[in-house]
């Protein structure tokens, strides 16, 4: 492989973007971060984060996803564009697509995905619409003939694993656990740093071109029942388990006001329907741990040991 691709990251100060930015720098890519001037000049945590990225060699480019001229200028200087924008800006990624199309030299675009594979979900509203917006962005990329990689990284460990998927908790429960469905759907939990690493590994890899990169890591793919049993073994205690049948989950989604019901509907897709693992990875997909066996990812077992 020749020189490493120059990467433009849009959304570098966000929840997952910061890990992708760090991985890009750590793996030696010339890294450009598109940020609003107001973010860079503030005294916020995000501004401090940008300073640390600058110290590690990142190039800060002022601009915005809503400013076409600044997007075009930023895209001109790179080979690969990675978007990690948040849910409110998913639809605005059509602006990135326009800029990439206009410049015409980008070798790969990674739109903001980093969750379930939106082409393989059985979600109910309002999650259904959330996934459909991401799918719409995919179709726009394909229609313009822009080379792409979609990263399906499944569950963020920091959201779902550290709490054993319990709403409102920041550490695994030690008394009672609520399990949606029968607890047998297999789910994939991935540490955010590892999502960053696998994403950047894919940037210059021809095997991931015009494919979905699935992070279906064998040591991190387990059911909620298996996860709870693993935790119980670690703390040498049996938790009280409350199972919520699907009908009750659907009623809860219907009775909970928007937007609070989005997270419940996403959990229904993951933990009841099993949408992260209920399909085979076909020819349009590749699996990260098979492509990059050298990446020593944090296992679920190791992750939970930090909370004992």
Swiss-Prot record:
Query: Any one Gene Ontology biological process term?
Result: lignan biosynthetic process
One Pfam family hit? NmrA
Q: What CDD domains would the database entry show?
A: PCBER_SDR_a (cd05259)
What are the recorded GO MF terms, alphabetically?
oxidoreductase activity, acting on NAD(P)H, oxygen as acceptor
Disulphides: none
Instruction: Tell whether Transmembrane helix is among the UniProt keywords.
Output: no
The catalysed reaction is:
(-)-dehydrodiconiferyl alcohol + NADPH + H(+) = (S)-isodihydrodehydrodiconiferyl alcohol + NADP(+); (+)-dehydrodiconiferyl alcohol + NADPH + H(+) = (R)-isodihydrodehydrodiconiferyl alcohol + NADP(+); (2R,3S)-dihydrodehydrodiconiferyl alcohol + NADPH + H(+) = (S)-tetrahydrodehydrodiconiferyl alcohol + NADP(+); (2S,3R)-dihydrodehydrodiconiferyl alcohol + NADPH + H(+) = (R)-tetrahydrodehydrodiconiferyl alcohol + NADP(+)
* Residues at which NADP(+) binds: 11-17, 36, 46, 138
EC class, as a word, reads: oxidoreductase
UniProt-listed Enzyme Commission number(s): 1.23.1.-
Q: Which family does it belong to?
A: Belongs to the NmrA-type oxidoreductase family. Isoflavone reductase subfamily.
The free-text function statement in the UniProt record for this protein reads: Oxidoreductase involved in lignan biosynthesis. Catalyzes the NADPH-dependent reduction of phenylcoumaran benzylic ethers. Converts dehydrodiconiferyl alcohol (DDC) to isodihydrodehydrodiconiferyl alcohol (IDDDC), and dihydrodehydrodiconiferyl alcohol (DDDC) to tetrahydrodehydrodiconiferyl alcohol (TDDC).
Q: What is this protein called?
A: Phenylcoumaran benzylic ether reductase PT1
């Amino acid at each position: 492989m020749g020189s490493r691709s120059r990467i433009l990251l849009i959304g570098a100060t966000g929840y997952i973007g910061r890990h992708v930015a760090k991985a890009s720098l750590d793996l030696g890519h010339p890294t450009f971060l598109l940020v609003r001037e107001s973010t860079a000049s503030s005294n916020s945590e995000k501004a401090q984060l940008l300073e640390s990225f600058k110290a590690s060699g990142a190039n800060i480019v002022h601009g915005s996803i809503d400013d076409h001229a600044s997007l075009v200028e930023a895209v001109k200087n790179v080979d690969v564009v990675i978007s990690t924008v948040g849910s409110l800006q998913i639809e605005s990624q059509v602006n990135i697509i326009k800029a990439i199309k206009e410049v015409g030299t980008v070798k790969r675009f990674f739109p903001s995905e980093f969750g379930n594979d939106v082409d393989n979900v059985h979600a109910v509203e309002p999650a259904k619409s959330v996934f459909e917006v991401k799918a719409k962005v995919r179709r726009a990329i394909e229609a313009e003939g822009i080379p792409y990689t979609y990263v399906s990284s499944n569950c963020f460990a920091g959201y779902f694993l550290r709490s054993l998927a319990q709403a409102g908790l920041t550490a695994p429960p030690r008394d009672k656990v609520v399990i949606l469905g029968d607890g047998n759907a297999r789910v994939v939990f991935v540490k955010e740093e590892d999502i960053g690493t696998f994403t950047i590994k894919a940037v210059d890899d021809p095997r991931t071109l015009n494919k979905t990169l699935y992070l279906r890591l064998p040591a991190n793919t387990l059911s909620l029942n298996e996860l709870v049993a693993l935790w119980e073994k670690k703390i040498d205690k049996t938790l009280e388990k409350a199972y919520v049948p699907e009908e009750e989950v659907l009623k809860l989604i219907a009775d909970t006001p928007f937007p609070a019901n989005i997270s419940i509907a996403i959990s229904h897709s993951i933990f009841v329907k099993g949408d992260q693992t209920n399909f085979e990875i076909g020819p349009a997909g590749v699996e990260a741990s098979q492509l990059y066996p050298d990446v020593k990812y944090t296992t679920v077992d190791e992750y939970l040991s930090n909370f004992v």
